[in-house]
């Protein structure tokens, strides 16, 4: 069914990934002599968990649920890249282009708000070896880059920035005052994240696949001013496999 702009605007539908019927339990054959691409990869997060330090020192830190406070613009979409067949029969997806990042803010139970850049930039994800077809038992696992939430020209409330602004907003800070130095000296950090894509539905005729994903990455660190939080993101995904 074709929807118009008026049908979609203000409903949140634009943030949802396409889905496949529950009966889509087929297989998409892979020919090692051919090359393939993954197109229209869409990642729709449904749960954001943040690792919280326990109040009791005898307990271990654990991921706790949060509340999303960002508007309906959290999904990654139109991601594409090469799907390579390796010598051991495994498949490797290399992300090349697409809407591969979204700034997101979540709120913890105590009221603290955690900004993060939900992303899969430069994702390289591989399957298990000896894959002759993509089925509901196929899993992709890999790493991606997590850029800084802020860019070089961002100025904080005191006018400090990486490429512009004041060098310091403190009159005469102590030489060994590390906390003040971290706030003054801005840094563009690039960290790593991990993701697993678990295929649950396959349309062997069209090459469409769908399933669930779980991603782990770090939150924003305010350009080095404080320690980032560990964030776990869970959701659903959709993609299309096609010959290159």
Swiss-Prot record:
What does UniProt give as GO cellular component?
Answer: photosystem II oxygen evolving complex; plasma membrane-derived thylakoid membrane
Question: Which protein, by its recorded name, is this?
Answer: Photosystem II extrinsic protein O
InterPro entries according to UniProt: OMP/PagP_b-brl, PsbO
Q: How does it sit in the membrane?
A: Peripheral membrane protein
Task: Quote the function comment for this protein.
Answer: One of the extrinsic, lumenal subunits of photosystem II (PSII), which stabilize and protect the oxygen-evolving complex. PSII is a light-driven water plastoquinone oxidoreductase, using light energy to abstract electrons from H(2)O, generating a proton gradient subsequently used for ATP formation. Required for dimerization of PSII and for binding of PsbQ to PSII.
Matching PANTHER family: OXYGEN-EVOLVING ENHANCER PROTEIN 1-2, CHLOROPLASTIC (PTHR34058)
Q: Read off the lineage from the record.
A: Bacteria, Bacillati, Cyanobacteriota, Cyanophyceae, Thermostichales
**SUPFAM superfamilies named in the record:** OMPA-like (SSF56925)
Where found in the cell? Cellular thylakoid membrane
Q: Which GO terms describe its biological process?
A: photosystem II assembly; photosystem II stabilization
Q: Spell out the subunit comment.
A: PSII is composed of 1 copy each of membrane proteins PsbA, PsbB, PsbC, PsbD, PsbE, PsbF, PsbH, PsbI, PsbJ, PsbK, PsbL, PsbM, PsbT, PsbX, PsbY, PsbZ, Psb30/Ycf12, peripheral proteins PsbO, CyanoQ (PsbQ), PsbU, PsbV and a large number of cofactors. It forms dimeric complexes.
Q: Annotated Gene Ontology MF terms? A: oxygen evolving activity
Q: What is the originating organism of this protein?
A: Thermostichus vulcanus (Synechococcus vulcanus)
Q: Which residues cross the membrane?
A: none
Keyword field: Manganese, Membrane, Photosynthesis, Photosystem II, Thylakoid
């Amino acid at each position: 069914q074709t929807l118009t702009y008026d049908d979609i605007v203000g409903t949140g539908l634009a943030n949802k990934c396409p889905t496949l019927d529950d009966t889509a339990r087929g297989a998409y054959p892979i020919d090692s002599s051919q090359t393939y691409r993954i197109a229209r990869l869409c990642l729709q997060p449904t749960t954001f968990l943040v690792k919280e330090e326990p109040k009791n020192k005898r307990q271990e830190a654990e991921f706790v649920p949060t509340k999303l406070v960002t508007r309906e613009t959290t999904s990654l979409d139109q991601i594409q890249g090469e799907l390579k067949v390796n010598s051991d029969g495994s498949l490797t997806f290399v992300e090349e282009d697409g809407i591969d990042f979204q700034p997101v803010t979540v709120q913890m139970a105590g009221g603290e708000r955690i900004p993060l850049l939900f992303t899969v930039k430069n994702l390289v994800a591989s399957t298990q070896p000896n894959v002759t077809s993509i089925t509901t038992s196929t899993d992709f696992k890999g790493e991606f880059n997590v850029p800084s939430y802020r860019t070089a020209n961002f100025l904080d409330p005191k006018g400090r920035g990486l490429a512009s602004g004041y060098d310091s907003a403190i009159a005469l800070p102590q030489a060994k005052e590390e906390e003040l130095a971290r706030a003054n000296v801005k840094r563009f950090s690039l960290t790593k994240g991990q993701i697993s894509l678990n295929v649950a539905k396959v349309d062997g005729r069209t090459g469409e696949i769908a399933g669930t994903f779980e991603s782990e990455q770090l939150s924003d660190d305010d350009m080095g001013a404080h320690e980032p939080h560990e964030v776990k993101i869970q959701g659903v995904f959709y993609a299309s496999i096609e010959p290159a």
